[in-house]
Amino acid sequence: VFLHGYGQSRMGWMTTPDGREGWSTSFLRKGHGVFLVDQPRRGEAGSTAAMTTDSIDTWSEDSKEYMPGDQAWYTHFRIGRVAPERYEGSQFPAGEEAQDQFFRQMTPNTGSFDITVAAAAMDEVMNDVYEMTGQKSIYVTHSQGGAVGWEVDPENVAAIVAIEPGGTPEIGSEQYNALLGANIPIVIYFGDYIDNGSEDIQSTSFWRTVRDTAVQFAESYNA
């Protein structure tokens, strides 16, 4: 079961900005059942243009309602400092067409993000998948979807794969104890350009904090 991150939809699992096969097809080819989910109040109507008060700013105190512009996405995803420049060694597809398709995948909310609503919806998804397959699901989350992943009832979860989650459960919290008590295997992945990002981009410090907190979480969870 795959859940996308903020500003995205299930399309991010289905293809790449340069048109290659996405995660879902790769897993299907290996014989796995794949279930792609759009968060409540999201959808597949991606952006062709978006307004923002600051095209460089990548974070906001009002982030639940904030819809960054193209440049903000570019820096927050750590592709480069200013589009179309890319960080040295970046594996993001080169060229204007891939960049344009990446921006078009960004999808605004139709309402505010409510983690309780999203987690309840994902609980139903996990229950439905179990009824269909008779098996617990490996839950793959990305970014904001990671926060939802920690909130889901672990009853029908076989494992969690968190791709750059926007946060991890506080050690000793209800979510932490529920996962630990259910003995859920967890693997967390972070990409590159976290420690060498531009200091004047607020999301640079955000990703460092999130990554460092995830390391602390993993050390405690595996102790």
Regions inferred by a protein language model and the residue ranges of each:
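Extended, charge-rich helix/loop segments that form flexible
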Residues: M67-F113
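The conserved beta1-alpha1 loop
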Residues: L3-G5, D38, H142, E164, ...
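Hydrophobic anchor at the start of a short beta-strand
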Residues: V34, S137, I186, A223
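Conserved acidic catalytic loop of the alpha/beta-hydrolase fold
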Residues: I115-S137
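The feature captures the conserved acid-bearing segment of alpha/beta-hydrolase catalytic domains
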Residues: A159-N222
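Aromatic pocket-lining residues of Rossmann-like dinucleotide-binding sites
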Residues: F27, V152-D153
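Gly/Ala-rich beta-loop-alpha elbow adjacent to hydrolase catalytic centers
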Residues: V140-G149
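Short, surface-exposed "cap/lid" segments of acyl-processing enzymes
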Residues: F2-A83
